[in-house]
Amino acid sequence: EGQPGEVELEQAYIEWDFASQHSLKAGLFLIPVGMINETHEPNTFYGTERNSVEKNIIPATWWEGGAAFSGEINEGLSYDVAAHSGLFLESGQYKPRDGRQKVGKAKADNIAFTGRLKYTAIPGLELAASVQHQVDMTQGEGSEAVSGTLFETHIAWQRDDFQLRAL
């Protein structure tokens, strides 16, 4: 009571299809890293808790404000390239999950870059690799810049009722 209200959104962007199979979006979007960040509803992972990697290292659910190019290079081979607000880790924080910010209040003195290639040309198979880099994860508030780079690859294969996933 007596506090201002707040609305939280995961996604709010404008997307422009500037060429066949290629688009640019600007706004608030989910970062294209990991297996479940973009589709993170409970039926996309096993159990009631997310796995430790996509909970603590890849901070799913992770969204940022920025701009991103997406498209299909060839049938079944797609790309995503984004420049966006980055994580903000204060002194003593070390988990990327702790660095997520509310975009409306985000410190964005140092932008981050993310890229992903994803292969889905074979039915039932997904291969992907992502990289996310930020020159200063302290957003200029530390005594020196602390850079961070996150590499991720994964495979998901499904045949009938059998599924194999590796991250």
Can you annotate each of these PLM segments?
Residues 80-82, 90-95, 130, 139-141:
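A short secondary-structure junction signal
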Residues 119-167:
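Detector for outer-membrane/organellar transmembrane beta-barrel domains
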Residues 1-89, 109-114, 118-126:
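Outer membrane beta-barrel
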Residues 3, 11, 21, 93, ...:
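Residue-identity detector for glutamine
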Residues 2, 54-60, 101-106, 137-144:
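Outer-membrane beta-barrel domain signature
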Residues 41-47, 96-100, 146-147:
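Flexible, surface-exposed loop regions and adjacent strand-edge segments
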